[in-house]
């Protein structure tokens, strides 16, 4: 098995894999593997389910009372960034491709009555506006997807690469675009995906 892994990953890759497995076992025991480097801030508010797997460059930011919750068997690939000041929940058996950004907050509310959202105020000085994000079970987020505050993604949803997701997405659909729209629905009677 060791020779098979060394052949698959190459010598340097195999050494990194062994290092990452050892560090994961020491710091994140219920996780399958977290590939380093990773950047986890406020890990007391970040909960990993069983068999969590990550690629390199994972960045998790739980600011203030923010919570990030991963259910079991979640896999995130390289350079995923998740930021929370309220709540981000990711359901079991979910796959997140590389370079995905998920956030539950904005720098400013951009409402007519909010003077703190003025373009004359630097973005990092604006009032943070938040709304919880919930990603269901068996969801697949494609490469470079952005999930915005207040989004609720139902179970079994597939999100196409480069999509921007906001709002409530019904279960068992395929969505894509900017903003993401439903392009297919799963028909449980025929057991086929059908155009929306």
Swiss-Prot record:
Its EC number is 2.3.1.-. One of its GO terms (biological process) is lipopolysaccharide biosynthetic process. Coiled coil: none annotated. GO terms for molecular function: acyltransferase activity. One of its GO terms (cellular component) is cytosol. Pathway: Bacterial outer membrane biogenesis; lipopolysaccharide biosynthesis. InterPro entries: Hexapep, Hexapeptide_acetyltransf, Trimer_LpxA-like_sf. It comes from the Bacteria. Transmembrane segments: none annotated. Keywords: Acyltransferase, Lipopolysaccharide biosynthesis, Repeat, Transferase. CDD domains: LbH_MAT_like. Belongs to the transferase hexapeptide repeat family. Putative O-acetyltransferase that transfers an O-acetyl group to the O antigen. This is Putative lipopolysaccharide biosynthesis O-acetyl transferase WbbJ. It comes from Escherichia coli (strain K12). The gene is wbbJ.
């Amino acid at each position: 098995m060791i020779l098979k892994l060394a052949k698959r990953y190459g010598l340097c890759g195999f050494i990194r894999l062994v290092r990452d497995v050892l560090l994961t076992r020491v710091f994140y025991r219920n996780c399958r593997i977290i590939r380093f480097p990773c950047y986890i801030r406020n890990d007391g508010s970040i909960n990993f389910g069983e068999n969590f797997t990550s690629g390199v460059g994972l960045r998790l930011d739980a600011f203030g009372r923010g919570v990030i919750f991963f259910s079991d068997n979640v896999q995130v690939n390289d350079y995923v960034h998740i930021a929370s000041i309220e709540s981000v929940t990711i359901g079991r058996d979910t796959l997140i491709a590389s370079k995905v950004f998920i956030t539950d907050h904005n720098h400013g509310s951009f409402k007519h009555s909010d003077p703190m959202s003025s373009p004359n105020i630097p973005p990092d000085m604006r009032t943070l506006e938040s709304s919880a994000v919930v990603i269901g079970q068996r969801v697949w987020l494609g490469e470079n997807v952005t999930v915005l505050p207040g989004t609720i993604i139902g179970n079994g949803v597939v999100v196409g690469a480069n999509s921007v997701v906001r709002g409530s997405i019904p279960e068992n659909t395929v969505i894509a675009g900017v903003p993401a729209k439903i392009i297919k629905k799963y028909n449980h009677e025929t057991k086929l995906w059908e155009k929306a």
